[in-house]
Design a protein with these regions (language model features):
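Single, functionally critical "micro-switch" positions that shape active/binding sites
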Residues: 29, 121, 148
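N-terminal active-site beta-alpha-beta segment that forms phosphate/nucleotide-binding
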Residues: 2-85, 90
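Short, flexible, solvent-exposed loop/turn segments with mixed acidic/basic and small polar residues
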Residues: 41-42, 124-130
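Ligand-binding beta-strand-loop-alpha-helix segment within the catalytic cores
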Residues: 51-126, 138-145
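Single conserved hydrophobic/aromatic residue that forms the stacking wall/gate
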Residues: 143, 147-153
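Short, solvent-exposed beta-strand edge segments and adjacent coil->beta transition regions
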Residues: 132-134
Length: 153
């Protein structure tokens, strides 16, 4: 495992310190959160915690199912206790950009339904000025042509 991958693993596991028995959890998307999901599965199987996840992407859904984490769909979940998600980049003010992995809309909905949110990222995601990573763009299907006009200028 590379040094960066080891940092991601440590960060992902550390984020799970906020997880308590009986929680309904938003499960984010990305390479660092993957380690949080693995740790959540361990908390269920080895610690006996009763946890349910709400995935923010199909990748997260597949991994969670493989690991045996019980899941609910976003629309069936109600209020979530905690969401753990990653960031594409963050600055010295802890402003951040996320959603570059293609799950922006679901990540936003899950975050809005959560009482609390932990954003997990290692130092490699820190930038002086936001915008080093490609900026995700969210388009609602009802306004596709309007959005295309805006992007084209």
């Amino acid at each position: 495992m590379s040094d960066v991958e080891h940092l991601k693993e440590q960060a992902g596991i550390a984020a799970c310190r906020f997880v308590k028995d009986g929680m309904l959890l938003g499960l984010g998307t990305g390479s660092t959160v993957r380690y949080s999901i693995i740790e959540i599965a361990r908390l269920i199987t080895e610690e006996g915690m009763n946890l349910i996840g709400v995935p923010t992407s199909e990748d997260t859904r597949r991994l969670s199912e493989e690991l045996g984490i019980p899941l609910l769909n976003i629309e069936d979940s109600g209020t979530l206790d905690l969401t753990i998600d990653g960031a594409d980049e963050f600055d010295h003010n802890f402003d951040l950009i996320k959603g570059g992995g293609g799950a922006l809309t679901r990540e936003k909905v899950v975050a809005l339904k959560s009482k609390s949110m932990v954003v997990v990222a290692d130092h490699t995601k820190k930038v002086e000025v936001l915008g080093a990573f490609d900026l995700p763009v969210e388009v609602c299907l009802l306004y596709t042509s309007d959005a295309a006009d805006e992007v084209d200028g």
